[in-house]
Amino acid sequence: MRCPYCGSLDTQVKDSRPTEDNTAIRRRRVCPDCGGRFTTFERVQLRELMVVKRSGRRVPFDRDKLARSVEIALRKRPVETERVERMLSGLVRQLESLGDTEITSETIGEMVMEGLKQIDDVAYVRFASVYRNFREARDFESLLDELQLGERKAEALAKLKRADRTASESEPE
C-alpha cells in the first residue's frame, strides 16, 4: 500500500481488525520511511458497478464519494458513525444485488434519501435539496409536507396494528 504522505510503496500493517458491523477490515499502517500512520479499509466487492449520470456519461461507482456526500448532509448532526457506515454498507450491498452493473445516479440518489430518512430528517432534507436541485422555498415546503405525510401514515399504521392485536387478544376462544 502506498504511503499517502511520502509515496513510499513499503508500508507495514500494525493492527488489523473487523469493523463493528463486520462488513470491512480496518488496518492501521505505518510507513518505515517517513513514520506516517494511516488507516485503510478492505471491503468485499461483488461486482464492478458503473454509474450512469444524468448526462449519459458512465463513471465507476465510488463508495468514498457516496460516503462524502452523506457526511456533508449529516454535518453537525448527532448521528453515530457506525450507524452511517451500516447504512452505506447496506446500500452498496443493495446496489450490488440489483443484478445490473450499470445503475443510474437517480436510483442511487433515491436509495440514499430513503436511508437518510431512516437516520435523520434534517440530513434527509439537506441531501434532497441538493439532489433534487431545490430553487425556491416552495420546494422545501413540498418535501416537508411529504415527510410529515409519511410520518402520519406510519403512525396510523402502528395504531391499526395495535388495535388489531388488542382485538385478537380479547376474542373468545
UniProtKB/Swiss-Prot annotation:
Negatively regulates transcription of bacterial ribonucleotide reductase nrd genes and operons by binding to NrdR-boxes. It holds the Pfam family Zn_ribbon_NrdR. The keyword rRNA-binding does not apply. PROSITE patterns: ATP_CONE. This is Transcriptional repressor NrdR. Belongs to the NrdR family. Binds 1 zinc ion. Keywords: ATP-binding, DNA-binding, Metal-binding, Nucleotide-binding, Repressor, Transcription, Transcription regulation, Zinc, Zinc-finger. A zinc finger (unnamed) spans 3-34. GO terms for molecular function: ATP binding; DNA binding; zinc ion binding. GO terms for biological process: negative regulation of DNA-templated transcription. The keyword S-adenosyl-L-methionine does not apply. Its cofactor is Zn(2+). Residues 49-139 form the ATP-cone domain. It comes from the Bacteria. InterPro entries: ATP-cone_dom, NrdR-like_N, RNR_NrdR-like.
